């Protein structure tokens, strides 16, 4: 299976659909952002949040080169504050960023989850690839008033386009 189709398969499996508004938290250079923006289409919106200006610049160049106009970049200082209104997104991607490297303290991760909870519509999902802390992440997310709805296991793409078997956990608000 080619790289791009594996990414699309994973995103569709976690619930991304045409017309949705999705936040890719810690989007990096856009491995999942670009395909997610293609799935949500022109009626949808993809917020790409990262603290690295260079990777956001790269992401926006890629988006422009493929004609995508539905991606909005969001630079952050790394604080767990998301500059979106309450109940404004249908889904949040939290792929390989919810771990102690980026958020060393449990309280930091809890503040991130509280912000995500705030911006999620009542029916929204949060999709987490807890690459570096699988069991701990599940417990922390459930303790933040989310419940595990489903799991997706398949080939996922990591830094430098490395393919690896992984598991994505999908949660919803309680």
Could you describe each region identified by the protein language model?
Residues 2-20:
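Conserved alpha-helix/loop element of class I SAM-dependent methyltransferases that forms part
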Residues 23, 29-80:
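Class I SAM-dependent methyltransferase SAM/SAH-binding core
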Residues 37, 106-122:
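A short glycine-rich, Lys/Arg-flanked "PGG" loop and its adjoining helix->strand segment in the class I
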Residues 79-92:
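A short acidic, Gly/Pro-enriched loop at the edge of an enzyme's catalytic core
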Residues 94-97:
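A short beta-strand submotif of the Rossmann-like class I SAM-dependent methyltransferase core
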Residues 123-130:
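Conserved beta-strand signature within the Rossmann-like core of class I S-adenosyl-L-methionine
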Residues 133-145:
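Short alpha-helix
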Residues 145, 157-174:
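Core SAM-dependent methyltransferase catalytic element
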């Amino acid at each position: 299976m080619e790289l791009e189709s594996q990414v699309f398969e994973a995103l569709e499996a976690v619930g991304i659909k045409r017309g949705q508004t999705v936040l890719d938290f810690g989007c990096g250079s856009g491995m999942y952002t670009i395909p997610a923006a293609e799935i949500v289409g022109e009626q949808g919106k993809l917020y790409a949040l990262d603290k690295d200006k260079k990777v956001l610049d790269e992401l926006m160049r890629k988006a422009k080169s493929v004609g995508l106009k539905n991606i909005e970049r969001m630079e952050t200082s790394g604080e767990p504050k998301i500059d979106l209104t309450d109940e404004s997104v249908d889904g949040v991607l939290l792929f390989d960023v919810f771990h102690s490297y980026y958020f060393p303290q449990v309280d930091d991760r809890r503040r991130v989850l509280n912000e995500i909870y705030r911006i999620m519509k009542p029916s929204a999902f949060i999709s987490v690839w807890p690459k570096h802390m699988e069991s701990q992440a599940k417990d922390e997310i459930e303790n933040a008033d989310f419940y595990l709805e489903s799991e997706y296991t398949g080939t996922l793409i990591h830094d430098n386009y490395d393919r690896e078997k992984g598991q994505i956990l999908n949660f919803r608000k309680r």
